[in-house]
């Protein structure tokens, strides 16, 4: 974290990042703990929505958020937007709750049983490989490679799931197996107009391309090191915990904005049967997405509306966090802004020169 050159900085208990900034073991423990919280939230919300699901109505008319995602993956015997067998969704919910407990145990194990700094393990050991310093580009690129590897494996899993199990096709109203269309010209052309994608084969082709691209990047970053001397142009003096957090928030903001606009307009990935109709973009106190379906209005919103608005504002605040931490990483001290306003308040200026007053200096000068 940015200390502005001070070595004796202390943080309050609620500054959670300070507890893991220079403790790589605790940093991993916090990651595992966060994963457990996400799993628990997913499982609990699935059970919550299942308890309120009305089998006489399509999912898209009930304003659910989690069930449409499971139905889109072909879980639950979905047909024309109606769940025909909810047992699969129940199994998914219970598995998430079980794994949340496993992750919680792993987080506590890494917090209380293992060393809080992985650098204390013997050189060359497996734990020591994942020890890092925020200004060490060699180790950070090694860890980045493993992140890319898991993202690539996630894309592979999604493509294979659609190929052998099937996903929901809104055009046919049933779950069907989808072969990916790995057409590089299609992938290139949909970089900008991805909102208009209307083919599940193209969607799977895009994920197949991402799987290859991410896996190649993972191999590159795991087995390579930055070329040449580590200079200021490559981040020397800037690479820090604040800088990494800033760039991470920028990436999260970008993905959140993409998800918001995609969910609001695309009806192939977000079928009307599952999420409600497309949305309008409106401007009041702030921009927002509004439902066009007459079933929703007032305090009742579609799943599409929830997803789009939540991701839009989440992306907005992520972007502010990116600027905040980015400026701190560059050395800007926000306390200087407070001092500036204090100085402005202490100066009295009159438009009438005869009545202008000067605030006496707080320092005492010796008599001359």
UniProtKB/Swiss-Prot annotation:
Pfam family, one: PSII
Cofactor(s), by name: divinyl chlorophyll a; divinyl chlorophyll b
Subcellular location: Cellular thylakoid membrane
Organism per entry: Prochlorococcus marinus (strain MIT 9313)
Triggers of expression: Transcription decreases upon iron starvation.
Recorded family membership: Belongs to the PsbB/PsbC family. IsiA/Pcb subfamily.
NCBIfam families: PS_antenn_a_b (TIGR03041)
Keyword hit for Membrane: yes
Origin superkingdom: Bacteria
Protein name (Swiss-Prot/TrEMBL): Divinyl chlorophyll a/b light-harvesting protein PcbA
Topology in membrane: Multi-pass membrane protein
InterPro entries per the UniProt record, alphabetical: PS_antenna-like, PS_II_antenna-like_sf
Any one GO cellular component localisation term in the record: plasma membrane-derived thylakoid membrane
UniProt cross-references to SUPFAM superfamilies, sorted A to Z: Photosystem II antenna protein-like
Keywords from the UniProt entry: Chlorophyll, Chromophore, Membrane, Photosynthesis, Photosystem II, Thylakoid, Transmembrane, Transmembrane helix
GO biological process, one term: photosynthetic electron transport chain
């Amino acid at each position: 974290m940015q200390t502005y050159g001070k070595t004796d900085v202390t943080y309050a208990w609620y500054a959670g990042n300070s507890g893991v900034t220079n403790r790589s073991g605790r940093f991993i423990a916090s990651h595992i703990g966060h994963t457990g919280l996400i799993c628990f939230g997913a499982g609990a919300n699935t059970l919550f929505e299942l308890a309120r699901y009305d089998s006489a109505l399509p999912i898209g008319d009930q304003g659910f958020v989690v069930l449409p995602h499971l139905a889109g993956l072909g879980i639950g015997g979905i047909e024309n937007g109606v769940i025909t067998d909810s047992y699969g969704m129940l199994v998914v919910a219970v598995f998430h709750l079980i794994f949340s407990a496993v992750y919680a145990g792993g987080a506590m194990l890494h917090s209380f049983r293992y060393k809080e700094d992985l650098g204390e393990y013997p050189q060359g050991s497996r734990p020591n490989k994942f020890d890092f310093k925020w200004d060490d580009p060699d180790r950070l690129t090694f860890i980045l490679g493993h992140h890319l590897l898991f993202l690539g494996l996630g894309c592979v899993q999604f493509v294979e799931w659609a190929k052998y199990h099937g996903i929901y096709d809104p055009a046919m109203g049933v779950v069907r197996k989808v072969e990916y269309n790995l057409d590089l010209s299609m992938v290139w052309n949909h970089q900008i107009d991805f909102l208009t994608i209307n083919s599940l084969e193209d969607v799977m082709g895009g994920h197949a391309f991402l799987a290859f691209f991410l896996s190649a990047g993972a191999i590159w970053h795991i087995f390579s090191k930055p070329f040449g001397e580590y200079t200021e142009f490559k981040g020397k003096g800037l690479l820090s915990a604040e800088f990494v957090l800033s760039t991470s928030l920028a990436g999260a903001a970008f993905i959140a904005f993409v998800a918001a606009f995609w969910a609001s307009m695309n009806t192939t990935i977000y079928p009307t049967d599952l999420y409600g109709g497309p949305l309008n973009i409106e401007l009041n106190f702030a921009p927002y997405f509004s439902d066009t379906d007459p079933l929703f209005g007032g305090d009742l919103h579609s799943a599409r509306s929830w997803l789009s608005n939540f991701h839009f504002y989440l992306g907005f605040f992520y972007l502010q966090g990116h600027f905040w931490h980015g400026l701190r990483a560059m050395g800007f001290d926000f306390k200087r802004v407070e001092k500036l306003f204090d100085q402005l308040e202490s100066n009295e200026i009159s438009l009438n020169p005869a009545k202008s007053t000067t605030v006496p200096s707080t320092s005492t000068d010796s008599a001359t």
